[in-house]
Amino acid sequence: MSGDEQSIYMVYYKNMIIFLLLFIAHCLADYYLQRHSWIMDKVARHERSVGLLYHMLTHVLLTGATLFWLVGFNGSWFMLWIWILIIGTHYLIDIWKTYQTFTLPYYLADQIGHIVVLILATYLLINSHALPDSTYTFLLEHQAIIIWSAALVFLANPMAITIMVILMPLREKMHQKDTSIAVS
């Protein structure tokens, strides 16, 4: 691998590790720390929901902690703008989702929207040169832990919920057949 290829590879790799850290924070807040009662409150009250407020506070704390850990506070307000971008768009996407039915297309649109924002935030962070060299060194030294953590966090609860949403129409059809058999 030439020097240019290696440098392109390292930039890509750093981007992926930073994205994975933001993705872990997102998954923890969306799938592990969000209570069912908050979800039901969001569906019932939409943007006036206390559940939405609690959910957003969870994202504020986890995303903020992740960004602060990555960038630190070096006097730059750029991190604050990234934080506002992630939290603000998450809030808007979640409000939009409360007005939709809980079906696969809307579920996927919701999660893809969040992931696109995290990719954009990663891109902006990398190109801002706000991340200190010590952060890059740490990320590269602990890359395996970060990758495995992201895989475990994603494959446990988020994947189970995704499979449940995929299978919901089939389950409803099976339930309808069971009911029609019992009535006959």
Predicted regions and their residues:
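Helix-coil boundary and interhelical linker segments in multi-pass alpha-helical membrane proteins
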Residues: 4-20, 63-81, 122-147
